[in-house]
Amino acid sequence: MDYEALKDQWSDVEDRDGIRLSWNTFPSSRMEASRLVVPIGAVYTPLKEKPDSPLLQYEPVTCKAPCRAVLNPYANVDVRARIWICPFCLMRNPLPPHYKDITESTIPPELHPMSTTIEYQLARPAPAPPIFVYVVDTCQDDDSLKALKDSLIMSLSLLPVNALVGLITYGTMAQVHELGYTECAKSYVFRGSKEYAAKQVQEMLGLASGLRPNMPQQPARPPLGPAARFLLPVQQAEFQITNVLEQLQRDPWPVANDKRPLRCTGVALSVAVGLLETSFQNAGGRIMVFTSGPATEGPGHVVGPELKEPIRSHHDIDRDNIKYYKKAVKFYDNMAKRAANNGHIVDVFAGCLDQVGMLEMKNLANYTGGHILLTDSFTSSQFKQSFVRIFDKDAKDNLLMGFNASLEVLTTKELKVTGLIGHAVSLNKKSSSVGETECGIGNTCAWKMCGIDPASSYGVYFEIANQGGPAAVQPGPQRGMMQFLTYYQHSSGHYHLRVTTVARPLSGPAGDPTLAQSFDQEAAAVLMARIAVFKAEVDDGPDVLRWVDRMLIRLCSRFADYRKDDPTSFRLEKNFTLYPQFMFHLRRSQFLQVFNNSPDETAFYRHVLNHEDVGDSLVMIQPTLDSYSLEHEGSQPVLLDSASIQPAHILLLDTFFHILIFHGETIAEWRKAGYQDQEGYENLKVLLEQPKEDARELISDRFPLPRFIVCDAGGSQARFLLSKLNPSTTHTTGGYGGGVTSQIIFTDDVSLQTFMDHLMKLAVSGTS
């Protein structure tokens, strides 16, 4: 099968099952697997939308303990004997009584060959409706606070009618608003400079009395404990909550000109976590933190109140010149673990031109499946539109967000799972599917994600099991299998289970060509990028770049065709040719190069990379570039190269985080002269409008909303484009063929051509 046909096949599998594998044939021995260089891995999007597949309204049929695999199309079913054989453990299981009518021609949906992904609505109702706690920073100017209040009031109408809502505001002090008290505005105040233990928070809010262990609790009803004073159903309390929000004032504490406002983000957060963990353990909830500056007092503060003391930079972190960093990270990580253990999500939204301490707070979202959003202000359309998108709904008017989610992976005996890289924490569950090595969050076959949405994607890594001695070859084609079980609380109030079962052939004897042909370079690049970013969190930057280079050289040595020590003979098969340039752009990307980005921005970019699927992640690693000119109708994809900058062309760059329209020198002059508004120049007007329309389409369904930049050749904003291009024409090389028609880039970075020359030289020398 040729590469294009294989790509279409992988794309169909991704549409149906939300999964892409780095290798679509599994090696049959551990030795063979070690020579692959790129690990066997899957980028899996559990809740990928499947509008055409049915929601099964009954409990799944599972194999006996300890296996617990769910009945799937790969199971052998004997309809006469009413038994099925589990493909994971080969145990025989009786079919339940309500399957008595099945025949070869009438089978239940979960056995249909195309039902490799199926979703069940479980009978178990959620213990409480979804909970939303808004944690709002009041140390901000009036315009920003008003815009934020408007966004929050608007969001109340987007919540499910039974959702519980709470409000905590903070500045110099943290205040928990007692929304259930209608006589007047009433709140409990916590001192911003003091650290409160979980027990103290519960006692001060009067929640401890609600912890009577034998209190009868009706399912799907909130526990009618003391927390009901602070968390009210939105339908019943929309008026009160709106009133409280409208009356919110800027923090009254005076701020001197040379000082930052005193802001106790850590106290507000610990109160929110304490409030939910007392009464709503393992019930779906979201703590949404809106901050307009760094925490400057109390636990978790990231900078002092003196303005002359700058917030830490990457340079400070490298030199270990970080006064507050370690203590703050320890505090927020502890909060994140508490929230994750209870199934609660934490989102952090920043509306501030300066850093807010996102680097220290990042694990609040990374451990709990929350969102991180960095914007310049809450008045910006980037914040307003991104915030609304969080509350997107499906055709049945249910929120497209799952709560309290967990993922379990089962494998057949040939495979073992080595870990997961994505927004989750380990559930420390051991099984026969757990591998010996560790990649990412390992030593477990189950993870808790808490928050999950239709775009949430996870990198799951596998190894080939160590078979002792020569295994007896079974008759028929051999295959390895994996099953992904995603449990989550649906916003309709029920638990759902999404099951995806994957089977792939095992390779034949050593040197089987099907192994190399099964390599999906796009999925592999994304899985390797996740490992590189995971390493970058703990290792030095240069070490990570060396690891990326070493892996690329080894992969090329193993799979390219060449004569030893002859770089000119180097050839890669079609399904490997793009991989080196993905790695070239990954090395230069903001995920691994921190120069020109603040630590907060680096944390944000890495967070988003670990959330998206293969397609969107590739746009982040290697942005797309389209060119528009009067000679061609519509857009033409062009190389991400400085040679693509031409005076009479318009370029549209999509980096996922930025969408940029760049006018070449001549086009910019024509536009400034106003030719597009004159008669006879309608084609120029159309040309100027076209990239804007295409940009609008790109922005339409993206989260977070990208920054939109329009610039001209030579303008200061053009740096966003120049920094992404392969510098094939620099001040040292001049243009192609001596004529300088394209842009010259002033940089010492190597070009893709130089990079490839070095790669070929090293790969054919066999010294790696």
Swiss-Prot record:
A single Gene Ontology MF term assigned here is:
zinc ion binding
Q: Where in the cell is it found?
A: Cytoplasm; Cytoplasmic vesicle, COPII-coated vesicle membrane; Endoplasmic reticulum membrane; Golgi apparatus membrane
Q: Does the keyword Metal-binding apply?
A: yes
Asked if the keyword DNA-binding belongs to this entry, the reply reads no
Gene3D superfamilies from the xrefs? beta-sandwich domain of Sec23/24, Sec23/Sec24 helical domain, Severin, von Willebrand factor, type A domain, Zn-finger domain of Sec23/24
Origin, by domain of life? Eukaryota
Positions annotated to bind Zn(2+): C63, C67, C86, C89
Which GO biological-process labels does this protein carry?
COPII-coated vesicle cargo loading; intracellular protein transport
Q: What function does this protein fulfil?
A: Component of the coat protein complex II (COPII) which promotes the formation of transport vesicles from the endoplasmic reticulum (ER). The coat has two main functions, the physical deformation of the endoplasmic reticulum membrane into vesicles and the selection of cargo molecules.
- Could you describe the subunit structure of this protein? The COPII coat is composed of at least 5 proteins: the sec23/24 complex, the sec13/31 complex, and the protein sar1.
What family is this protein classified in? Belongs to the SEC23/SEC24 family. SEC23 subfamily.
What is the recorded name of this protein?
Protein transport protein sec23
Report the source organism: Aspergillus niger (strain ATCC MYA-4892 / CBS 513.88 / FGSC A1513)
Q: Which gene encodes it?
A: sec23
